Swiss-Prot record:
<protein>
    <recommendedName>
        <fullName>Mobilization protein MobL</fullName>
    </recommendedName>
</protein>
<comment type="function">
    <text>This protein is essential to promote the specific transfer of the plasmid in the presence of conjugative plasmids.</text>
</comment>
<feature type="compositionally biased region" description="Basic and acidic residues">
    <location>
        <begin position="130"/>
        <end position="146"/>
    </location>
</feature>
<dbReference type="InterPro" id="IPR005053">
    <property type="entry name" value="MobA_MobL"/>
</dbReference>
<feature type="compositionally biased region" description="Basic and acidic residues">
    <location>
        <begin position="358"/>
        <end position="370"/>
    </location>
</feature>
<feature type="region of interest" description="Disordered">
    <location>
        <begin position="300"/>
        <end position="338"/>
    </location>
</feature>
<keyword id="KW-0184">Conjugation</keyword>
<keyword id="KW-0499">Mobility protein</keyword>
<feature type="region of interest" description="Disordered">
    <location>
        <begin position="358"/>
        <end position="378"/>
    </location>
</feature>
<dbReference type="Pfam" id="PF03389">
    <property type="entry name" value="MobA_MobL"/>
</dbReference>
<feature type="compositionally biased region" description="Basic and acidic residues">
    <location>
        <begin position="212"/>
        <end position="232"/>
    </location>
</feature>
<feature type="region of interest" description="Disordered">
    <location>
        <begin position="212"/>
        <end position="253"/>
    </location>
</feature>
<comment type="similarity">
    <text>Belongs to the MobA/MobL family.</text>
</comment>
<feature type="compositionally biased region" description="Basic and acidic residues">
    <location>
        <begin position="241"/>
        <end position="253"/>
    </location>
</feature>
<keyword id="KW-0614">Plasmid</keyword>
<feature type="region of interest" description="Disordered">
    <location>
        <begin position="130"/>
        <end position="149"/>
    </location>
</feature>
Amino acid sequence: MAIYHLSAKPISRSAGRSATGAAAYRAGVEITDERTGLVHDYTRKGGVLHSELILPGGGTADRAEFWNGVEAHHKRGDAVLVREIEISLPTELTAEQRKALAVGYARALADRYGVAADVALHAPRTVTDRELEKHPDQYHETDPKTGRRHNGNWHAHILLSACHVQPDGTLGKKAVELDPIHCQRAKIENLVDRERVRWGELANAALEHHGHAARIDHRSHAKRGIEAEPTRHLGPAAAGIERRTGEESRRRHDFEREAMERLARAQAQGVLERESRGLERSIFDLSGDMRAAFQERDRLREQQERAERERREQERAREAQRQQEKQQADKAASDQREAERILAQLLEKAPVVDRKTEKAIDGLFHDIARSRSRGRGR
């Protein structure tokens, strides 16, 4: 049964990933990371049907040497090293036809974007007896040669270098056309949107060429009006556990639990929608009263703000009056000190005065004392 799947994701150092580790896992080989000294050994992984490193123009390179070069080329600690594309291959095709389709698509990607494309074809996951007991209606196929049951998910991983590559393997600048952030700023389609359509056309052309009526559709279930629970990928750790033990991983159980919770929420949502329609009618009847309440609230708020503004203006006026009175009192005190100084100078120059002058001086001292008394009263 031909199914459509194409996804893209970055492999970056900020997530603790490496180009060497990703390439070793997809190809099922051993690669030593020269930058960190880590040995990525996936030679016992199994299920890798074919792997091939393709350079622009159809050239090739040593996988370990090339991806170590990519690691050395990117200096930043949060650098995106690889853009990975994962595709599902039509089960209707033969092994050689699937290989030709995946390798041809990887070669087209390398030439289109001027990057390296490391493609690896993986076999489908084995379906165990326990899984069939638990989910008897799940899709599975049986290999006529080996009798092995599998889920029919023939797929391929294509690692695209995040930088441009020359036909001789020389690394260049960042391949911005693979960066979704750059595509968004440039207002152009991102990598996934472009390649979903292209891969669908390429896979359908292969199905037609080999005489199969089945076709795939790159559109999502939602856009096609199909209500279906989307599939989830386990990832390398959980998939490895299932291969080694033959038991379902905890991650698979988590996915199933999440799916059941989403179905329960959807059912509850249907009930809520029916109830909400009744509430909408009640709210419509209350809308007139609500508008009046909002208008009254706004009127009271405006009244409070106006009273607050008046209070602040009165406070500023009182403060200005206090400052003016203080300035007047300070000036009066200064005038008094100046008069006392002048009188003291006169007395020093004329220690003996007549009766009339003495009377005038006494009157002046009396005025100064009275002025001081008024100043203290303020």
